[in-house]
Amino acid sequence: MQSITIRRPDDWHLHLRDGAMLEGVIADTSRTFARAIIMPNLVPPVVTTSDATAYRDRILKALPAGHHFQPLMTLYLTEHTSPDDVEAGAKSGLITAVKLYPAGATTNSHGGVRDLEKAMPVLERMARIGLPLCVHGEVTTPEVDIFDREAVFIDTVLDPLRKRLPELKVTMEHVTTADGIDYIKAAQSNLAGSITTHHLIINRNAILVGGIRPHYYCLPVAKRENHRLALRAAAVSGDARFFLGTDSAPHVDPLKECACGCAGIYTSINTMSCLAHVFEEEGALDKLEAFASLNGPAWYGLSPNEERITLSRQAEPVVFPAKIETGAGPVTVFDPMFPLHWQVMPQA
């Protein structure tokens, strides 16, 4: 197959940051993707509907001329979040989901939830009104090995929560383990998972073999090869419970290339080329549209995009920049460590 036309994709987990970084990265998303769920872990975080309104306005202001893109806003769940504010934001159409960060789990998550019981009034309201909860599914207790955080989270946090509130709609974001995939598959309802581009491509060797490679470090951290293969199988299966959420997370290089570097991989610019490679490799190009364009909207109760994009297979590798320059500083682009031959063609 030399070309494939699919509905315009969406990104169901995206970090755009703010200020100069937002202005520097947004075009890489809005050029290809029609919508994205925007992560709320700014400094300070997006905790109220008023915060989300202001942030959405900054995103729209930063859009390049001629780009059509809808930011789908989320709220950062805290132990003090107002159920009434959440419901008002959801009913207004502004708020698409609420994000649960266990305190300390990832970038700018120190204000996250430490005692889930204190957030139960919000979660109960969300269950009642049908508003999804997006979870960063890792525990942060120091005695748990970093490679086991997701599996332990499922057993000790997520499964008890879902048994207590079975009507709560939960998205397990950036699933990284076979445990997570199996847990979603076993669920009868109200559970789905997003999968990143990079977790389909790298395992933990990418970070550690031949030297420490900070631009492959992310949270949740990449796992063993058997987990990567489980993610691939889920992504290419066509199962409607799995969809694309890139977790594209820009950090300027000085914050990555240091003694205590930030977690995050920047994939917005080359995600669709990477995905086409993965799905072609798996003999599943016919399932790419479901993963990138159909399953996510169905889960979030939205219509798929009417616009189409075409990916064309080039004889020579498609060249992406090694770095992008932003007003905040340089950001290294994800290198999949293989040549990319699929290119998103300019729209007529």
From Swiss-Prot:
SUPFAM superfamilies assigned: Metallo-dependent hydrolases
PANTHER family: DIHYDROOROTASE
Native species: Rhizobium etli (strain CIAT 652)
NCBIfam families: pyrC_dimer
Domain of life where this protein originates: Bacteria
Protein residues bound to substrate: H15, L16, R17, N41, H136, L219, H251, A263
UniProt keyword Nuclease present: no
InterPro entries recorded: Amidohydro-rel, DHOdimr, Dihydroorotase_CS, Metal_Hydrolase
Function: Catalyzes the reversible cyclization of carbamoyl aspartate to dihydroorotate.
Protein name: Dihydroorotase
Family listed: Belongs to the metallo-dependent hydrolases superfamily. DHOase family. Class II DHOase subfamily.
Keywords tagged on the record: Hydrolase, Metal-binding, Pyrimidine biosynthesis, Zinc
Record-level GO BP terms: 'de novo' pyrimidine nucleobase biosynthetic process; 'de novo' UMP biosynthetic process
Binding site for Zn(2+) 2: K99, H136, H174
Quaternary structure and interacting proteins, as annotated: Homodimer.
Cofactor(s) the protein needs: Zn(2+)
Pfam short name (any one): Amidohydro_1
EC number, as in UniProt: 3.5.2.3
Co-factor remark: Binds 2 Zn(2+) ions per subunit.
Cellular component terms per the entry's GO annotation: cytosol
Reaction catalyzed: (S)-dihydroorotate + H2O = N-carbamoyl-L-aspartate + H(+)
Pathway membership: Pyrimidine metabolism; UMP biosynthesis via de novo pathway; (S)-dihydroorotate from bicarbonate: step 3/3
